[in-house]
């Protein structure tokens, strides 16, 4: 590797909005993240329900698409 052309690779602290922090390595001075393994719903087991039904209905209404018949 050539000398002097690569960025410095430092040990940093990554901070999450939930207050959790951990050490990592990066070329950046610091990293802030919105979610981490301590607060992400997949890891905590707390699932958030998304309002996708309202979005689908709004899409169908906007483009005049009839709802598909339900299979019985």
UniProtKB/Swiss-Prot annotation:
Keywords: Metal-binding, Ribonucleoprotein, Ribosomal protein, RNA-binding, rRNA-binding, Zinc
CC cofactor: Zn(2+)
Pfam name, any one: Ribosomal_L31
Transmembrane segments: none
Gene3D superfamilies on file: Ribosomal protein L31
Cofactor annotation comment: Binds 1 zinc ion per subunit.
S-S bonds: none
Annotated GO CC locations: ribonucleoprotein complex; ribosome
Protein's UniProt keywords contain Transmembrane helix: no
GO biological process: translation
GO molecular function terms noted in the UniProt entry: metal ion binding; rRNA binding; structural constituent of ribosome
Residues involved in Zn(2+) binding: 16, 18, 36, 39
Keyword Cell division: no
Source superkingdom: Bacteria
InterPro entries (alphabetical): Ribosomal_bL28/bL31-like_sf, Ribosomal_bL31, Ribosomal_bL31_A, Ribosomal_bL31_sf
Family of the protein in this entry: Belongs to the bacterial ribosomal protein bL31 family. Type A subfamily.
HAMAP family named among the record's database cross-references: Ribosomal_bL31_1
Reported function: Binds the 23S rRNA.
Assembly and oligomerization: Part of the 50S ribosomal subunit.
Full protein name: Large ribosomal subunit protein bL31
Organism per entry: Geobacter sp. (strain M21)
């Amino acid at each position: 590797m050539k000398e002097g052309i690569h960025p410095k690779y430092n040990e940093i602290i990554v901070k999450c909005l939930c207050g959790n922090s951990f050490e990592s390595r990066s070329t950046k001075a610091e990293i802030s993240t919105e979610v981490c393994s301590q607060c992400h719903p997949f890891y905590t087991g707390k699932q958030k329900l998304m309002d996708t039904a309202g979005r689908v209905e709004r899409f169908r209404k906007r483009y005049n698409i009839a709802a598909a018949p339900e299979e019985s």
